[in-house]
Amino acid sequence: MNRRNFMAGCATCAGAMVIPTSGLFAAGDGAKKKKRIRVLYSLHADVQPGPDWPNVGFNFTPVMKRMTAALSAGCPEIEFIPTTANGPEQAKAILEKDKSANIDGYVVMQMNCWNRVVQSMVASGKPVLYADFLYAGSGGFLVYSSGFLRRQSKNFAFIGSSQFSDVVEAAKCFMTIEQPDQFAATVAKVRKQQTQAPSGQDCKPDEIDLLSPTAWKEKMKQSKILTIGGKGWRGPKSVIEELGVQVAEIPYAEVNDAWKIADKEKSKQVADMWQKRASKIADVSRKELENSAAMYLGMKNVLKKHAADAITINCLGGFYGNHIHAYPCLGFHELCNEGLVGACECDLLSTATMVGLKNLTGGRTGFISDPVIDFAKRQIIYAHCVAPNRAFGPNGQSNPIEILTHSEDRQGASLRSLLPTGYMTTTIELAAFNKELLFHRGKAVDNIIEDRACRTKLAVEPDGDIEKLMTQWDRFGWHRVTAYGDLKDPLFEIAKMLKWKITEEA
């Protein structure tokens, strides 16, 4: 079990929050009939019952009311009818009722990540505006949007923005189109007008001692990844064959046993180190810090035993399944600081990518993220509850951290790494299963402080076309790996050596 499918069983009856509105509005030469637009909030429940983005216990009701009120105030010529739906069954039932309700189109707000509601509305043929509630629905928003873009669904339009006024402006397009197949292009024009202009890619200097492609290839053969809680997404075969990395699956019990017997005094010393490093500690006890430190020491001993330099664990599946008893987030953080790889969610593809980056750069592992795209700021935000605070490698400068709970379930210990700004970053996946390098880069510009979703949120202005950055999520999934440095040339040389396809996302 992982957090992507943990909420699959959660359900809530679709309810309606109808704001009374007049069916007519005054417009110039007389009264005209309002357009009727159904607003569908796609989510598990009004109050979130379990761990997922944005977080357990999150109350969506006031957010939905504010959104509906803003749409109604900003588009007085449209009657908005708000409803909730948790998946395709409820979405199809709403569609059936709407056949006799004179509904002209749909706004679908993705409030949780993976609820499949928008698909039914797009299939209706009516114009659909698909909007992301940032740091809440972003995974599904990216993956589902790229699928519709690949299929060139002309009645489908999208907007992801930290400014809800951008959603309101896009909704006004319901009044300006004559046919549903004009909707995508009409909203795209508005979205591009609302997107912040590029601010430039001039970055601070960052010298890196890089391996040659042939030396990198030999180094990869010396690396070994341990997977715990499964074989990893896409499986080990292509990673072994294409990248030369060794992969071994080991049981949860081995890691849990190593945690149990970790030296108590050393655990206290590691906890002391983290306490001194953190500029803030909130909702995490000293006992939990020592528990996390024991997990770090246990993982390090397991790596040593297997002569491995990378470990990836299906963390939440292990914790909720009672297989492990400490969150590994801080341990992963410390391993990455040391130039080893600690990676989340048993994501073998991204773990192998981190191994490739640290071998190329002499220890810059980067970090896995669940990205969010904010068109208002022209930013992609890399969000996760694990990241190093030595972005320039084990011997590089450090940056501040805050120790907080793991965000989605508000348990355990994880961290917010306040990463350096002004530097070029490289974001990739070494997609061995497809013999493809997925690549984009951009300037680190901010650390977003937002309680919803994962703790670390590095904001980057992409080098290139942010619109194009919407197009590959359905093919490669949500995760990306981001490392500091302009690594375009050496990575492209490696891809050519491997005879891989290069896909530039932006």
Functional labels for PLM-detected ranges:
Residues 4-27:
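N-terminal export signals
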Residues 20-43, 53:
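C-terminal segment of N-terminal export signals and the immediately downstream linker at the start
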Residues 46-64, 234:
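Glycine- and acidic-residue-enriched helix-capping/strand-helix junction motifs
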Residues 56-60, 64, 72-145:
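Trp/Phe/Arg-rich N-terminal binding region typifying the photolyase-homology
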Residues 75-82, 139-266:
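Cap/lid and interdomain-hinge subdomains that line or gate substrate/regulatory clefts
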Residues 121-144, 152-163, 335-346:
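Short, acidic/small-residue loops that bind anionic groups at enzyme active sites
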Residues 339-446:
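C-terminal catalytic subdomain
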Residues 411-506:
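Extended hydrophobic packing segments that form well-structured cores
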